[in-house]
């Protein structure tokens, strides 16, 4: 699963930037400014090389981080959604459910059992 090592340098930089900025409301423009590259090129090539869209990648990483925070802290779901810069808690729930098939609440309750 360590395909990352084979990614072009700019993709690795892009992924690193995303990972370091999960708490921000990241946009394609932020990333293109950071990498000093054309946004359309980034968007097109990221999907071609990584296999999912940049937005999907960012959201998946945010959900992974949310799962970690739910498992390892007592932080409320509202705080988690705020920390990860989701528009609001319902948007957080929607995105979380899209990638896990369950809501953050259901996930949290499953861990308690």
Sequence positions of predicted segments:
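An amphipathic alpha-helical interaction segment
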Residues: 1-16, 37-43
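Terminal helix-turn-helix DNA-binding modules in bacterial transcription factors
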Residues: 15-16, 20, 25, 29, ...
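Aromatic-anchored, glycine/proline-accented short structural segments
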Residues: 27-39
